[in-house]
Regions:
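Glycine-enriched alpha-helix->loop->beta-strand junction motifs that scaffold or abut catalytic
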Residues: 41, 114-121, 140-147, 165-171, ...
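Hydrophobic faces of well-ordered beta-strands that scaffold small-molecule active sites
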Residues: 16-20, 45-47, 93-97, 122-124, ...
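Glycine-rich phosphate-binding active-site loops on the catalytic face of alpha/beta enzymes
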Residues: 42-53, 119-123, 127-130, 171-182, ...
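Catalytic cores of alpha/beta
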Residues: 27-37, 155-166, 200, 208, ...
Length: 260
């Protein structure tokens, strides 16, 4: 059974999904970060594939992507690192990147090798729904690779229902229409949007992302979904760390600590 399926069957609340950019701060940090995220209590890890034109990402993730590429990160290197990490942890792993990267590598080859490296799911923000239905779904299903789609406050209800049916991993509920990394208090308008998504009673688990940055915003997001995704705040913590393993553990512990 896919590890994502196992996770959501075993736990349906307060799921912590942490995103980081593979190959950042240093090329060989990927496995160390994965192992320490798992050890510290993260439920799910979203591994970002560095890309030169990350259109959905804010400045923090863009800079980390450029640094990772300069460090020498490639898809081949990433798959090798993931295979090494998978030998030491069974935590669900999701790759987040862009469909252009998959197309350049070859879709079937990419999915096959990602699965062999221990990847459980994909998030590809630029993958059109029609392209997924026409070609990519069969490839993903053949390798038990779950695919997650994103919805935003501007996504029409009918479209949300369609995407909810197509997402085979979880539904990525984007908290705002801005790029990633814009943190702050979750607004009343955002809460109303989350409640609207809840009311649709969609079949897939829902994780809220974009702007989740600390224990308080994580807990608030979890009131409206099965869990939340934290990315830019973690990358900022890694950027200033002398000890990546320690910084990773301390970050997760800070997110999971009780909120007064």
């Amino acid at each position: 059974m896919n590890r994502l399926t196992q996770l959501f069957a075993a736990k349906d609340r307060d799921i912590l999904n942490v995103y980081f950019t593979a190959g950042y701060p240093k090329l060989d940090d990927t496995a160390v970060i994965i192992e320490n995220l798992a050890a510290a209590g993260a439920d799910l890890i979203e591994v970002g594939m560095p890309y030169s034109d990350p259109m959905a990402d804010g400045e923090t993730i863009q800079k980390s992507s450029m640094q990772a590429l300069q460090n020498g990160m490639t898809v081949e290197v990433l798959f090798k690192q993931l295979r090494e990490a998978r030998e030491r942890t069974d935590i669900p792993l999701v790759l987040m990147g862009y469909y252009n990267q998959v197309m350049q590598y070859g879709p079937e080859k990419f999915v096959r090798e990602a699965k062999a490296a221990g990847v459980d799911g994909l998030i590809l923000p630029d993958l059109p729904v029609f392209e997924y239905e026409r070609e990519f779904r069969d490839i993903a299903e053949a390798h038990d690779m779950q695919v997650t789609f994103l919805i935003t406050p501007q996504t029409a209800t009918e479209r949300i229902r369609q995407i909810g049916k197509l997402s085979t991993g979880f539904l990525y509920v984007v908290s705002s229409s801005s790029i990633t990394g814009k943190s702050g208090e979750i607004t009343t308008g955002q809460k109303e949007y989350f409640a609207r998504i809840q009311a649709l009673d969609l079949p897939q688990p829902k994780l809220i992302g974009f702007g989740i940055s600390d224990a308080r915003s994580f807990r608030t997001a979890c009131e409206f979904a099965n869990g939340a995704i934290i990315g830019s705040a973690f990358i900022r913590a890694l950027g200033g760390a002398e000890d990546v393993a320690l910084a990773t553990r301390e970050f997760v512990e800070g997110i999971l600590e009780p909120v007064a």
